């Protein structure tokens, strides 16, 4: 009897690391025989790759589940990612959710769904225990626990800290809107910032083996990639879990020496890892994008201590100024959190003034969100009023806009090499420069090709 090919759609929430996870999952599901749809309304399976960095991220995932279930009641919704790892029971209680799969078991999803139309699963939805408490392969589970018949959502999670290595996540090429593939070479984090839940849902720091990284880059280049973004939860810690240790710098040198990749970009690197050697490496090769993203979080030494950050404002300023001296046209971005418990008006003023004098070119501003299980969620310090947090975030975003405008003006009139993105209008194409400026070139052009773009100060 003929059975139509099962279809799936996928939606991603969160950072570049989750982008990379979603791309790998998409490709694995395609390889398992499922067909990808661009919309959720007609898909047999809908995979939501969740984020849990803030309460708003959790809410966004829950709302997505409700919206998809209303639009497509017959779809089996699979929620995976960081929120699924942190609070699986919470997600499982939502109507429409068939499976909750934590980061610990995310790579098992294709096996879970591959033969859903061609294989009869034993048992009924209520036969099995809803959770697994230890990390186990899906093949080792009772098949009753894999039933996709209607019933309560099943939970597949495990101890994320049981994972001590990182496997290659096959990435998409450059088809569609995925012009600049993200290659995740590191996952997890051994730091314990007081506000951050990510180590508890991503596990300890793990690095992709150098030979595997080189081969993955080669595959992407053969697939047509011109630029690759290296990503990780704590990218600068790459290689510290190996014996003998290696470093991100050494890995980058191998990529430059052993592959034909035309441009490499970094997602985010912590300030203590932006060393003189690291900056010198960027200076030494035109194949590395002139773009640094360095999390700051606060310009107040008091708040940085409370956050359990492992640097102080003076070191951060030193690293940023070092970049600006070595690479005058580099883009330098930062993450900042406002409203951390105990952040006074003076603390915020210190942060604002600190950022104001630094040669940063843009900010990502976040409002503090207490995460269950983190130290900051238990602080005795008085919480900052929501209205105050909103005002502070607005002030920093305005500062970010001013800095971005000033940086763009400093580049006005230059013609810069830029890669075409899969975006544009009827008579223009959007491109991205090495130093993270978007520009428009006349005409409609294929994505993933290099062009010379003139920078205009008044262009968005």
Model-predicted segments: where are they?
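Contiguous mid-protein beta-loop-alpha structural module that forms a pocket-lining wall or clamp
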Residues: 343, 359-360
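Hydrophobic, well-ordered secondary-structure elements that form the walls
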Residues: 294, 335, 355, 363, ...
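A structural micro-motif
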Residues: 34-35, 75, 98, 261-262, ...
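Terminal RNA-binding accessory module
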Residues: 376-460
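Proteins enriched for Cys/Gly/acidic motifs involved in redox and nucleic-acid/cofactor modification
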Residues: 1-231, 236-238, 292, 313-325, ...
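Conserved SAM/AdoMet-binding glycine-rich loop
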Residues: 77-78, 86-87, 222-345
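Glycine-centered loop/turn positions within well-structured domains
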Residues: 107, 191, 236, 272, ...
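Flexible glycine-/small-residue-rich
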Residues: 12, 232, 296-298, 420, ...
């Amino acid at each position: 009897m003929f059975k139509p090919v099962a279809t799936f759609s996928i939606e991603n929430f969160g950072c570049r690391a989750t982008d990379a996870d979603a791309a790998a999952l998409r490709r694995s599901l395609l390889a398992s025989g499922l067909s990808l749809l661009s919309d959720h309304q007609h898909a047999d399976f809908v995979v939501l790759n969740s984020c849990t960095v803030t309460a708003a991220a959790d809410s966004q995932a829950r709302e997505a589940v409700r919206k998809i279930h209303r639009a497509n009641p017959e779809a089996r919704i699979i929620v995976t990612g960081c929120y699924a790892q942190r609070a699986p029971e919470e997600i499982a209680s939502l109507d429409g959710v068939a499976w909750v799969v934590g980061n610990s078991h995310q790579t098992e999803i294709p096996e879970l769904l591959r033969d859903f139309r061609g294989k009869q699963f034993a048992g009924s939805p209520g036969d099995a225990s809803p959770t697994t408490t230890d990390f186990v392969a899906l093949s080792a589970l009772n098949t009753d626990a894999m039933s996709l018949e209607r019933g309560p959502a099943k939970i597949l999670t495990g101890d994320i800290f049981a994972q001590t290595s990182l496997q290659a996540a096959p990435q998409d090429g450059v088809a569609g809107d995925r012009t600049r593939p993200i290659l995740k070479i590191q996952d997890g984090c051994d730091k314990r910032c007081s506000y951050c839940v990510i180590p508890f849902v991503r596990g300890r720091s793990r690095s992709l083996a150098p030979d595997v990284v080189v081969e993955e880059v080669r595959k992407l280049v053969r697939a047509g990639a011109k630029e690759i973004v290296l990503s990780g939860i704590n990218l600068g810690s790459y290689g510290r879990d190996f014996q003998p240790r290696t470093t991100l710098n050494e890995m980058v040198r191998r990529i430059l020496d052993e592959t034909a990749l035309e441009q490499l970009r970094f997602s985010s690197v912590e300030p203590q890892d932006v060393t003189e050697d690291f900056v010198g490496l960027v200076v030494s090769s035109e194949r590395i994008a002139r773009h640094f993203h360095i999390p700051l979080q606060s310009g107040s030494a008091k708040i940085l201590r409370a956050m359990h950050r492992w640097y102080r404002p003076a070191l951060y300023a030193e690293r940023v100024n070092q970049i600006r001296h070595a690479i005058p046209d580099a883009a330098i971005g930062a993450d900042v959190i406002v409203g951390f418990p105990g952040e006074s008006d003076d603390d915020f003023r210190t942060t604002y003034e600190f950022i104001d004098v630094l040669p940063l070119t843009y900010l990502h501003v976040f409002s503090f969100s207490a995460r269950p299980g983190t130290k900051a969620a238990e602080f005795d310090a008085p919480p900052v009023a929501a209205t105050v947090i909103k005002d502070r975030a607005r002030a920093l975003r305005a500062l970010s806009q001013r800095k971005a405008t000033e940086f763009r003006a400093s580049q006005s009139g230059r013609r810069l090499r830029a890669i075409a993105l899969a975006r544009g209008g009827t008579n223009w194409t959007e491109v991205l420069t090495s130093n993270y400026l978007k520009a428009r070139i006349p005409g409609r052009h294929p994505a993933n090709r290099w062009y010379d773009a003139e920078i205009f100060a008044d262009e968005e």
